């Protein structure tokens, strides 16, 4: 059976991935806060770090920062001394000064230059509005911003239940590990379970409601949980 490019990339272990695409050494949320201070764009920590707030930590090979696509210009202005690379289904292309963003681009990787590691990535939100966070895979799923984010220290994070919703599609070992480790309040757990049901993720809905785990889930692979992914 022929393996698709997407499957091949997502199947790489962390060492193989970084050997192919370059080394990662992610900044902390606090360092990113210093970097983006005063840029005028709202940015939010997403991904596995958002899913794990309040839970036992794991190693994270990267860090995801969500911004609205309308704010890319503000980001480019404050990061003019950095290199931004568009991600397109496994391919990386530099976003050069003065060149417009590719219309369907959803991710940007960030580093100083080719001799330096990748430091973080921007997830480009094309669906949320000034008033509401909107789930990109089904715009029926939406929440007021005050319900979608919370502040940890001085940094905004996507709430864990929203970060976990994004992870249900791929259900990789690290995604399952994040679900099983998550610390959700009662309303967040109920919202996530109901939304997973609505979107057809029955097993994740069951695990969210019950907190059950099989023996194989419990052995779940915290070791595999830190791998970087290029394709969502």
Residue ranges and their predicted role:
Residues 1-232:
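Compositionally biased terminal segments of proteins
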């Amino acid at each position: 059976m022929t393996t698709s490019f997407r499957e091949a990339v997502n199947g790489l272990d962390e060492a193989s991935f970084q050997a192919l695409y370059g080394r990662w050494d992610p900044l902390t949320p606090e360092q990113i806060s210093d970097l983006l201070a005063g840029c005028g764009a709202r940015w939010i920590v997403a991904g596995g770090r958002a899913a794990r707030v309040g839970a036992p930590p794991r190693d994270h090979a990267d860090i995801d920062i969500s911004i609205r696509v309308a704010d890319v210009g503000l980001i480019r202005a404050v990061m003019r001394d950095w290199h931004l690379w568009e991600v397109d289904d496994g391919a990386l292309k530099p976003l050069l000064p003065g060149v417009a963003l590719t219309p369907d681009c959803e991710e940007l990787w960030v580093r100083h230059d080719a001799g330096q590691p990748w430091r973080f990535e921007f997830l480009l939100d094309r669906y949320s509005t000034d008033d509401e966070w909107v789930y990109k895979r089904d715009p029926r799923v939406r929440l007021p911003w005050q319900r979608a984010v919370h502040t940890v220290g001085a940094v905004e994070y996507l709430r864990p239940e929203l970060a976990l919703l994004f992870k249900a599609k791929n259900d990789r070992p690290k995604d399952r590990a994040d679900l099983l480790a998550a610390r959700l309040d009662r309303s967040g757990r109920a919202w996530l379970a109901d939304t997973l049901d609505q979107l057809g993720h029955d097993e994740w809905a069951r695990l969210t409601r019950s907190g059950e785990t099989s023996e194989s889930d419990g052995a779940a692979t915290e070791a595999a949980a830190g791998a970087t992914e290029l394709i969502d």
